[in-house]
């Protein structure tokens, strides 16, 4: 039995004594303890060494007091498992080769055996689960098909997604063929993560806002829904969070995927999102990460605004406090610690 199951209870919209909190990229460069591990190796080797991935996954639980751990990995391990060469060069960016721009390129991508190609993530999940010893839940994750598609077609990050959109608008059948192939791997991967011990899954659609509403409905949401529904069919008790960053005008469509919770960027008032959705889903978020550059009083004031905006909890409401995106590398860890402690104390009055 989990000693602290608040995160899972909030996702399932069950009564909680307070609002749980974790933050995206909580295992990362803002922590001196993470940097000490990272100095010994490169980023992808850290992801692929279960002992090290376990160590950095647990650091924020012990140092910051967050209510959930998220396995240390990267969304691009899926692209790599499918046969692409992935280079992650800190401060320079991400390079994937060769870029996927033809049907022949798509055909060359493999549909990997998850245990064989991504076994290191599953080993890290199992090891972390043991080390956590039921202290807090463990989150597994994946990138969404659209986001992984953009990396594959662009060959890295992009400002305007020209190659990805060119394929969408000139060769829509080809775009769907690639999205479908990636989506199948994503689904198999998250099911294996749950089998290995993940208590919840988050789907990161980091580049969601690159698409218009109609295009998001056509090229992104159906694939997210496929993955969510596959999880529901096999592991109905495992909650899924969908983080479609800055898709604030189609919240209802995202809820229609069947997810338990929706991650919000900081560009929307969480109270407005709740008013629109009712208590159909739990909400996660949504403090602007740069607030953590602020003074202690300002950090508390901004966090308080979010708790107040979400408002009083009902029998079927759920809120997980988080940032609206990942914590930045130069943040002061003491400011995150202050935020975590403040949310734990301040949120009880709303429950």
From Swiss-Prot:
PROSITE patterns to which the protein is assigned, alphabetical: UROD_1, UROD_2
Localization per record: Cytoplasm
UniProt pathway: Porphyrin-containing compound metabolism; protoporphyrin-IX biosynthesis; coproporphyrinogen-III from 5-aminolevulinate: step 4/4
Record's catalysed reaction(s): uroporphyrinogen III + 4 H(+) = coproporphyrinogen III + 4 CO2
Principal subcellular localization: cytoplasm
GO biological process: protoporphyrinogen IX biosynthetic process
GO cellular component: cytosol
Family the UniProt entry places it in: Belongs to the uroporphyrinogen decarboxylase family.
The name this protein goes by in its record: Uroporphyrinogen decarboxylase
């Amino acid at each position: 039995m989990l000693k602290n199951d608040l995160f899972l209870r909030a996702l399932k919209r069950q009564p909680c004594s307070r609002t749980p909190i974790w933050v995206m990229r909580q295992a990362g460069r803002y922590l001196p303890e993470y940097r000490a591990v990272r100095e010994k190796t490169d980023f992808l080797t850290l992801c692929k060494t279960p002992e090290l991935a376990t160590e950095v996954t647990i650091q924020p639980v012990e140092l910051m007091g967050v209510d959930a751990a998220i396995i240390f990995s990267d969304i691009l391990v899926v692209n790599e498992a499918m046969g692409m060469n992935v280079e992650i060069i800190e401060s320079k960016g991400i390079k994937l080769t060769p870029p996927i721009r033809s049907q022949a390129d798509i055909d060359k991508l493999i549909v990997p055996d998850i245990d064989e190609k991504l076994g290191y993530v599953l080993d890290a999940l199992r090891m972390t689960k043991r080390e956590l010893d039921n202290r807090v839940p463990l989150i597994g994750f994946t990138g969404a098909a659209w986001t992984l598609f953009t990396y594959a077609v662009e060959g890295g990050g992009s400002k305007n997604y020209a190659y990805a959109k060119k394929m969408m608008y000139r060769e829509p059948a080809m775009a769907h063929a690639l999205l479908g192939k990636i989506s199948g791997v994503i689904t198999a991967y998250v099911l294996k993560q749950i089998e290995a011990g993940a208590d919840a899954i988050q789907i990161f659609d980091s580049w969601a806002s690159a698409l218009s509403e109609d295009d998001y409905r056509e090229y992104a949401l159906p694939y997210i829904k496929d993955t969510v529904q596959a999880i529901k069919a096999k592991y109905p008790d495992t909650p899924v969070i969908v983080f479609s960053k800055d898709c604030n005008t189609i919240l209802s469509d995202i809820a229609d995927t069947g997810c338990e919770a929706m991650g919000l960027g900081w560009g929307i008032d969480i109270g407005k999102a709740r008013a629109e959705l009712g208590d159909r889903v739990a909400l996660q978020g949504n403090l602007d990460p740069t607030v953590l550059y602020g003074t202690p009083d300002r950090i508390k004031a901004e966090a308080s605004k979010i708790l107040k905006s979400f408002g009083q909890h009902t029998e079927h409401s759920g809120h997980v406090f988080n940032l609206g995106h990942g914590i930045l590398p130069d943040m002061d860890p003491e400011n995150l610690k202050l935020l975590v402690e403040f949310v734990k104390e301040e949120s009880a009055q709303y429950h």
